[in-house]
C-alpha cells in the first residue's frame, strides 16, 4: 500500500485513514498475504504511527521514521497487489511501471483539477489502474488480468516515438 496524503484536491478525514488501513489489513488477511506499506512526505505522521503499532513494518518504507524517501522498487516487485492512494500521479506512475495492474484508492472528498482527473481517466482507459473507494478495499477483486507489462512497455514506446516526432518538428 503506497500512501500519499492531502493534495491536488484530495482530502482524507481521520476516519478514512483508519478505514483505509483496516480495510487493507482485511484484504491482506483474506488473501493470506503480508501487508507492506510505503509512506510519503504527505502521509500524516499519526497514520504512520498507527501502521507501526499494528503491523510488522520491517519490510516497509516509512518516510517519517526514516527521515528520507526510501527506495521501494523491490516492494513493487514482490507485491501480489499494489494499492496506491490516488492523490499523486507520480506514485501511480511508479506503481504502474512495475508492470502490475494498480488499485488506485480514493477518498470521499475529491476536488481535483480537471487536468488531473483526466490523467486518472487515461490510466483507467489504458487499464493500468482499477479505481476503488476506501470502503471497498477489503472486497476488491480484479475484473481482468493483473500482468500489464506488455501494455506498459507498448505505451512507453509509443510515448518515446511521439516525443521523437515532436522534436523533429
Where do the model's predicted regions map?
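Acidic, divalent-metal-coordinating active-site segment for phosphoryl/phosphodiester hydrolysis
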Residues: 90-97
Amino acid at each position: 500500500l503506497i500512501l500519499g496524503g492531502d493534495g491536488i484536491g484530495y482530502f482524507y478525514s481521520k476516519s478514512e485513514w483508519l478505514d483505509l488501513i483496516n480495510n487493507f489489513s482485511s484484504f491482506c488477511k483474506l488473501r493470506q498475504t503480508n501487508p507492506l506499506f510505503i509512506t510519503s512526505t504527505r502521509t500524516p505522521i499519526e497514520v504512520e504511527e498507527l501502521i507501526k503499532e499494528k503491523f510488522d513494518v520491517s519490510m516497509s518504507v516509512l518516510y517519517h521514521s526514516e527521515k528520507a524517501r526510501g527506495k521501494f522498487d523491490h516492494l513493487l516487485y514482490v507485491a501480489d497487489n499494489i494499492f496506491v492512494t490516488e492523490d499523486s500521479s507520480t506514485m501511480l506512475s511508479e506503481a504502474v511501471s512495475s508492470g502490475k495492474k494498480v488499485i488506485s484508492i480514493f477518498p470521499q472528498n475529491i476536488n481535483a483539477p480537471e487536468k488531473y482527473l483526466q490523467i486518472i481517466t487515461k490510466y483507467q482507459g489504458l487499464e493500468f489502474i482499477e479505481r476503488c473507494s476506501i470502503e471497498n478495499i477489503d472486497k476488491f477483486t480484479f475484473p481482468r488480468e493483473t500482468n500489464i507489462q506488455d501494455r506498459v512497455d507498448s505505451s512507453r514506446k509509443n510515448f518515446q516515438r511521439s516525443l521523437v516526432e515532436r522534436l523533429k518538428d
